[in-house]
Amino acid sequence: MVKLIASLLLLAVVAQAYGDFKCSLAVPEITKDWVDMKDACIKGMRNQIQEEINASYQYLAMGAYFSRDTVNRPGFAEHFFKAAKEEREHGSKLVEYLSMRGQLTEGVSDLINVPTVAKQEWTDGAAALSDALDLEIKVTKSIRKLIQTCENKPYNHYHLVDYLTGVYLEEQLHGQRELAGKLTTLKKMMDTNGELGEFLFDKTL
C-alpha cells in the first residue's frame, strides 16, 4: 500500500514537472498564397477519397466471402483482397495529395467514414465479378466528375487533373477491361462446365 501511494506521488510530481517545462511554440505566420485549391475541387477530392474507401470495404467483403470454408474459392479471395488493398492505397494517395497542397488543416476527422457494406454474399463467382465491374465503373465515373470539376474555370487545377488522368483514370480503364475479360471467360467456362468451370477458373486467379 505504501509503495502504491509512493508511486502515485512520484507520478504526480513527474506530470507537474512535464507541465511546467514542456515547450509551447506559436504557429509562425507565413504566406498562404501557395494554398490555392478551390472549395469545389477540395470537396470533390474528399468525396473521391470516400469512394475509394467504400470500394475497398466492398472488396474486403468479397474476399471474406470467398474465403469461407463453405465457399472455398482461394483464387477469388486473393483477387478481391488485392483489389481492396489497391483501393485503400488510392485513397491514401489522394490524402497525401491534399496534404501536399496544404488542404488538411481542418475537418480531418470527417475525411473518412467507415461505410456499411452493401452486399456480403454472392451466388457464384460470376455474380461477384459482375458486381466488381459495376463498382469500378462507379469509381471511374466519380473520377471523371472530379476531373471535370477541377479542370473547368475558375479552378483550372491542371496539375491535379493531369495526376488524376495520368494515374487514376488510366488504371481504372485498364482495370475495367481486365474485369470484363475475366467475367467473359468465367461465364463461358460456367456455361460449358457449370460449377466445375468456376472451380477451374478460380485456379487461374
From Swiss-Prot:
Localisation: Golgi apparatus; Secreted
Domain named Ferritin-like diiron: residues: 35-190
Keywords of this entry: Disulfide bond, Golgi apparatus, Iron, Iron storage, Metal-binding, Oxidoreductase, Secreted, Signal
Residues noted as binding Fe cation 2 in the record, renumbered to the chain: E87, E136, Q172
EC number of the protein: 1.16.3.1
Induction remarks: Up-regulated by iron-supplemented diet in the anterior part of the gut of third instar larvae and adults (at protein level). Up-regulated by iron-supplemented diet in the lymph gland.
Signal peptide (UniProt feature, chain positions): 1-19
GO MF term list: ferric iron binding; ferrous iron binding; ferroxidase activity
Keyword Kinase on entry: no
GO cellular component, one term: extracellular region
Any one Pfam family match given in the protein's UniProt record, by short name: Ferritin
PANTHER family: FERRITIN (PTHR11431:SF43)
Family that this chain belongs to: Belongs to the ferritin family.
Protein name, as recorded: Ferritin heavy chain
Source species: Drosophila melanogaster (Fruit fly)
